[in-house]
Amino acid sequence: IIGSTGSGKSTLISHFNGLNRPTSGRILLDGEDITALSITERARRGISYAFQQPVRFKGLRVGDLMNLAAGKDANIAEVCAYLSEVGLCARDYIDRELDASLSGGELKRIEIAMVLARGTALSVFDEPEAGIDLWSFQNLIRVFEKMYEQTRGSILIISHQERILNIADTIVLLKDGRLAECGPREEVLP
């Protein structure tokens, strides 16, 4: 999903995850109307969401958060694999608290690892490249490519980064809160 600042991108995806309710229309997930469902019910149905500004969970350790995301007691090897996939050394992070000692980029990568651990039907990312350094950005592209190849679900990304747009199969362009264009990348971004 692309569009200028204030075009409604974040508002649109806040309807998918249940943070906001639409004033008209319906939201369907695999043919099921989820418009009236709560955030929790939508998460149970398979929607995960990575915020533009990740949330800090004070008092919780990274390993605990990963277990919550996986929905089970993930073993150390699984947690390490998710953290490694987003470019974090698991040994350095698994026992760290999710507090002010973590940078925005570290939190962003932990949040992306959480989405990977959930393995949901719809993974929504709001500007996932925000606050991430160049090396991590290169790795982020690989993470999305791998998710796309290995998942049966859908990945929805709000971004302006050309390298992320280049891996998209469909681009949605919003303008003034309305759908301006939608189609294959080659047609929307000539």
Regions found by a protein language model. Give the residues of each.
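Helix-to-loop junction immediately C-terminal to a conserved catalytic motif
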Residues: 17
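Conserved ABC transporter NBD signature motif
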Residues: 25-32, 45
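Q-loop/switch helix immediately C-terminal to the Walker
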Residues: 53, 59-75
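Hydrophobic anchor residue at the start of the ABC signature
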Residues: 112
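ABC ATPase C-loop
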Residues: 115-116
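Walker B catalytic motif
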Residues: 127-128, 135
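Helical segment within the ABC ATPase nucleotide-binding domain
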Residues: 137-150
